[in-house]
UniProtKB/Swiss-Prot annotation:
NAD(+) binds at residues 273-287. It comes from Salmonella paratyphi A (strain AKU_12601). This is tRNA uridine 5-carboxymethylaminomethyl modification enzyme MnmG. Homodimer. Heterotetramer of two MnmE and two MnmG subunits. Keywords: Cytoplasm, FAD, Flavoprotein, NAD, tRNA processing. The lineage of its organism: Bacteria, Pseudomonadati, Pseudomonadota, Gammaproteobacteria, Enterobacterales. The gene is mnmG.
Length: 629
């Protein structure tokens, strides 16, 4: 039977991608349905209890700048906040927070349940309704049919999921949840390329059985950072420390002696695991010269006794897991409350997607999260927001949107996936972005909030705060430009006390701030340049914009040159065998990837600059050379 009311957008799956997709579509005014197998696990942190980190924190800030949920949720649930790379330049600084799993899940569910235009329904989805290569709805396990103009798949590791502990395995979407086998079979019937990936999680430890007195503590930062541009530290719950222990030779011997019982090394697992979050088995074998590995003992929440031992993800048998855990300092009497495991699951080749995350083959069908080959809550959330907003725009018959690589880490993420694909779980790093000086955490709102407002994602409160911040930045920069001090002035001595080279000529506040030894706080503590801005976010922007002005201008020039290639479009139906002068390898790769632009084509491995030149000449001769607006 059909549900009585049609929807504009259906989201299938209630993890980090699904919740952002649902919130985005509903915020844009579209009637949105979120289908989940269990309402109680909306926003569940299936693996590590943390948000952010290098590259990942940048994505969270971008999601927030577009009006998303993740940053707000972690500000309400974070029990330890830190700035990573705090001593380095602003481009690579990143925020990370330990999370209370229960508080995080509660924050997400509360936001969803209070979002207008959004209905949540608990039923597993077993089928899609596809008519003439166009998705028009979904079917649940009890045969209930829902119609919609667009469908977003955010099903995580549930598609034909298989859990491995030692040489034993069983079907599961994650521990305690069933897999989605009928939907997996249905998707395999569609013209989509599918493969298998693997991820894993460590055993959870009873905190009452750990001797923390012999372990080093790791505390959060003070003052505490915040994730959301709309947040403040007063929202944070009680803060707690993490602890550090290490593996040792005994640990490594236990692992080496039991590799024949590892499903990975016994050939039972075929899926490829994450390169940058390897299992402890992989670490011991790949880094055989290391006699120890650092392990972070992270609390799972303020009301939980469970500890997440970050660094010992494993699928070895339970008895071996016990030996591994008890071989480490402070853990000699530790008890495991949940075993570690590996999980294999289906993912679909993201090269079959447009940069909007819509399928190239099924109109109105969008993919986001681990189904696209990524790993991590943050990568999933960013994709979910993009897929949700584009599903909403499709249902409203509006032009879709995707950020450029020069505009956002989300743009880098989507371009990497859709252009290059992935053979292993993809994780975001700052090193993946060629314009990372422009793509900082601190300016995510300056880069994206205006676009978010145009798209209908940003509410009035955020928009007003954003404009207030812009005005504060502009006003303060003008004040510093127009405030001067001369070497003969009475205030010169106070200024010189902060300089390595005394003033030799008249200088403005901006001139002084450009000096590496002068901070904004120091400058505005001087009588001649006081007072400091009360708006701390605006003050941070003033300092960064002034100090890095020359570098930023050079990078902007590079971006403008690159945009000429990005905006040179390639026909979707072009058969590259027609282009004389291209090698067979280049022809095969271009026909396989079907790049949307010269810029995308240039990033395909094996497509040389010479091949790009040949292609540009051919397009011009054929009268097919055109650029997007």
């Amino acid at each position: 039977m059909f549900y009585q009311d049609p929807f504009d957008v259906i989201i299938i799956g209630g993890g980090h991608a699904g919740t952002e997709a649902a919130m985005a579509a509903a915020r844009m005014g579209q009637q949105t349905l979120l289908l989940t197998h269990n309402i109680d696990t909306l926003g569940q942190m299936s693996c590590n209890p943390a948000i952010g980190g290098i590259g990942k924190g940048h994505l969270v800030k971008e999601v927030d700048a577009l009006g998303g949920l993740m940053a707000k949720a972690i500000d309400q649930a974070g029990i330890q906040f830190r700035i990573l790379n705090a001593s380095k330049g602003p481009a690579v600084r990143a925020t990370r927070a330990q999370a209370d799993r229960v508080l995080y899940r509660q924050a997400v569910r509360t936001a969803l349940e209070n979002q207008p235009n959004l209905m949540i329904f608990q039923q597993a989805v077993e089928d899609l309704i596809v008519e003439n290569d166009r998705v028009v709805g979904a079917v649940t396990q009890m045969g209930l049919k829902f119609r919609a103009k667009a469908v977003v798949l955010t099903v995580g590791t549930f598609l034909d999921g298989k859990i491995h502990i030692g040489l034993d395995n069983y079907s599961g979407g994650r521990a305690g949840d069933p897999p989605s086998i009928p939907l997996s079979r249905r998707l395999r019937e569609l013209p989509l390329r599918v493969s298998r990936l693997k991820t894993g999680t460590p055993p959870r430890i009873d905190a009452r059985t750990i001797d923390f007195s012999v372990l080093a503590q790791q505390h959060g930062d003070n003052p505490m950072p915040v994730f959301s541009f709309m947040g403040n530290a007063s929202q944070h719950p009680q803060q707690v420390p993490c602890y550090i222990t290490h593996t040792n030779e005994k640990t490594h011997d236990v692992i080496r002696n039991n590799l024949d019982r590892s499903p990975m090394y016994a050939g039972v697992i075929e899926g490829i695991g994450p390169r940058y979050c390897p299992s402890i088995e992989d670490k011991v074998m790949r880094f055989a010269d290391r006699n120890q590995h650092q392990i972070f003992l992270e609390p799972e929440g303020l009301t939980s006794n469970e500890i997440y031992p970050n660094g010992i993800s494993t699928s070895l048998p339970f008895d071996v897991q016990m030996q591994i855990v008890r071989s480490m300092q402070g853990m000699e009497n530790a008890k495991i409350v949940r075993p570690g495991y590996a999980i294999e699951y289906d993912f679909f080749d993201p090269r079959d997607l447009k940069p909007t995350l819509e399928s190239k083959f099924i109109h109105g069908l969008f993919f986001a999260g681990q189904i696209n080959g990524t790993t991590g809550y943050e990568e999933a959330a960013a994709q979910g927001l993009l897929a949700g907003l584009n599903a909403a725009r499709l249902s409203a018959d509006k032009e879709r949107w995707a950020p450029a690589r020069s505009q956002a880490y989300l743009g880098v993420l989507v371009d990497d996936l859709c252009t290059l694909g992935t053979k292993e779980p993809y994780r975001m790093f700052t090193s993946r972005a060629e314009y990372r000086l422009m793509l900082r955490e601190d300016n995510a709102d300056l880069r994206l909030t205006e676009m978010g407002r145009e798209l209908g994602l940003v509410d009035d409160e955020r928009w007003a705060r954003f404009n207030e911040k812009l005005e504060n930045i502009e006003r303060e920069r003008q004040r510093l430009k127009s405030t001067w001090v001369t070497p003969s002035a009475e205030s010169a001595d106070e200024v010189n006390a902060h300089l390595t080279t005394p003033l030799s000529r008249e200088a403005s506040g901006e001139d002084l701030l450009r000096r590496p030894e002068m901070t904004y706080a120091q400058l505005t503590s001087l009588a001649a340049f006081a007072p400091a801005l009360e708006d701390e976010q605006a003050a941070e922007q003033v300092e960064i914009q002034v100090k890095y002005e020359g570098y930023i201008a050079r990078q902007q020039d590079e971006i403008e040159k690159q945009l000429r290639n990005e905006n040179t479009l390639l026909p979707a139906t072009l058969d590259y065998r027609q282009v004389s002068g291209l090698s067979n390898e280049v022809i095969a790769k271009l026909n396989d990837h079907k790049p949307a632009s010269i810029g995308q084509a240039s990033r395909i491995s094996g497509v040389t600059p010479a091949a790009i030149s040949i292609l540009l000449v051919w397009l011009k001769k054929q009268g097919m050379l055109r650029r997007s607006a």
